[in-house]
Amino acid sequence: MSAKIIAFSAVVATASAFAPTAGFVPRLRSGATSVNMAMDKSAKAPVITIFDHRGCSRAPKEYTGAKAGGKDDEMMVKAQSVKIEVSTGTAEGVLATSLAKMTK
């Protein structure tokens, strides 16, 4: 019986954690608060490269840090932020394709 009470209490606690507060009223944001919410126009995106040299005879030159002493020495994940360059023609083609699929 106590297990049922504990399970019920957990469900109630979870539901109340995700319920909005009674005094919450959505409002329009003023100009001062929306300034920091502007879209990032830097055109940068994360680029993730995975290097897996397990079983490869080529000496890895990408990583120059200390070795772990195991199979992880032959693997590496590189994450970087790169500015994405897209031509206007490519952008127009993607837009046209997207709009054509949205009307169907």
Swiss-Prot record:
The keyword Membrane appears for this protein: yes
UniProt entry tagged with the keyword Lyase: no
Biological process according to GO: photosynthesis
Top-level taxon of the source organism: Eukaryota
Localization annotation: Plastid, Chloroplast thylakoid membrane
Transit peptide: 1-37
InterPro entries: Globular_prot_asu/bsu (IPR011070), Phycoerythr-like_a_sf (IPR037011), Phycoerythr_a (IPR004228)
This protein's UniProt keywords: Bile pigment, Chloroplast, Chromophore, Electron transport, Hydroxylation, Membrane, Photosynthesis, Plastid, Thylakoid, Transit peptide, Transport
Membrane topology according to the record: Peripheral membrane protein
Residues carrying 5-hydroxylysine: K41
PTM entry text: Contains one covalently linked 15,16-dihydrobiliverdin chromophore.
A single Gene Ontology CC term: chloroplast thylakoid membrane
Annotated region described as 15,16-dihydrobiliverdin chromophore, given as residue ranges: 61-63
Binding annotation for 15,16-dihydrobiliverdin: C56, R58, K78
Stated family: Belongs to the phycoerythrin family.
Function: Light-harvesting photosynthetic tetrapyrrole chromophore-protein from the phycobiliprotein complex.
Quaternary structure, from the entry: Heterotetramer of 2 different alpha chains and 2 identical beta chains. The subunit composition could comprise of any combination of 2 out of 4 different alpha units with an invariant beta unit.
Further details from the record: The light-harvesting system in Cryptophytes contains phycobiliprotein complexes. Unusually they are composed of either phycoerythrin (CPE) or phycocyanin (CPC) but never allophycocyanin (APC), with only one type of biliprotein being present in any one species. Unlike cyanobacteria or red algae these proteins are not arranged into higher-order phycobilisome complexes, and they are found in the thylakoid lumen.
Protein name: Phycoerythrin alpha-2 chain, chloroplastic
Organism (species): Rhodomonas sp. (strain CS 24) (Chroomonas sp. (strain CS24))
Gene designation per UniProt: cpeA2
